[in-house]
Design a protein with these regions (language model features):
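Compact, glycine/acidic-enriched structural inserts
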Residues: 123, 127-139
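A surface-exposed partner-binding patch
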Residues: 1-104, 138-140
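Short, solvent-exposed aromatic-acidic interface loops
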Residues: 118-121
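Short acidic-glycine loop/turn motifs at beta-strand connectors
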Residues: 107-110
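Short, compact, well-ordered microdomains
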Residues: 113-115
Length: 140
């Protein structure tokens, strides 16, 4: 992972400890990958292993053990819930939800962060990667 991003995350979370959840173990993440039948995004994996579910700027990035600012619902539960409601590709999973209730997903094949807009029934690319999304929030 990008060393600049790692440093920025360390600085951000040192100044904003309330935005940190509880880190997951590598074994927990391996079990999730086996259950979901996909490989987690590298940046999301890093966040989960070091910080858990977090809030960075105005975005909630769900984990298995979230900051209390997010609540208890995991990214696995979100993904399963949205899979019941709409068509999510096998290589995609939900990492967040916007203020309108639209899921924000990572596509593990392309690394892109995409939003599914319920109102128009279409996907919209938000960022080329989760890393790019996080940097955009940290640089504000």
């Amino acid at each position: 992972m990008n060393p600049t991003l790692i440093k920025k995350l360390q600085d951000f979370f040192q100044k904003n400890p309330i935005t940190i959840g509880e880190p997951s173990t590598a074994d927990e993440l391996l079990l999730v990958e086996q259950t979901m039948q996909l490989k987690l995004d590298e940046t999301h994996r890093y966040l989960l292993l070091h910080y858990g579910g977090v809030v960075i700027g105005d975005i909630r990035i769900y984990g298995l053990k979230n900051t209390e600012l997010i609540g208890d619902e995991t990214f696995v539960e979100l993904t399963n819930d949205f899979r019941e409601q709409m068509s999510i590709e096998a290589q995609q999973y939900v990492i967040s939800v916007d203020d309108m209730g639209n899921p924000i997903l990572v596509d593990t094949a392309t690394r892109e962060v995409i939003l599914y807009n319920h109102d128009i029934g279409a996907y919209e690319k938000l960022f080329n990667s989760l890393e790019e999304l996080i940097l955009s929030k940290l640089n504000k």
